[in-house]
Amino acid sequence: MKRTYQPSKIRRQRKHGFRHRMSTKNGRRVLAARRRKGRKVLAA
């Protein structure tokens, strides 16, 4: 059986990257929450 996680850098960036987060209101909310929490890495 094939595993479900088949890593792809492009797909990862397009779905979870910083620019994608910035492109929506809720995405910006996610970044703000991660900044507030003090995360070292904000997005994939």
UniProtKB/Swiss-Prot annotation:
Keywords from UniProt, A to Z, are: Ribonucleoprotein, Ribosomal protein
Residue segments, region Disordered: 1-44
Record's superkingdom? Bacteria
Pfam families, A to Z: Ribosomal_L34 (PF00468)
Listed under GO cellular component are: ribonucleoprotein complex; ribosome
- Please, one GO biological process term? translation
Can you say what this protein is called? Large ribosomal subunit protein bL34
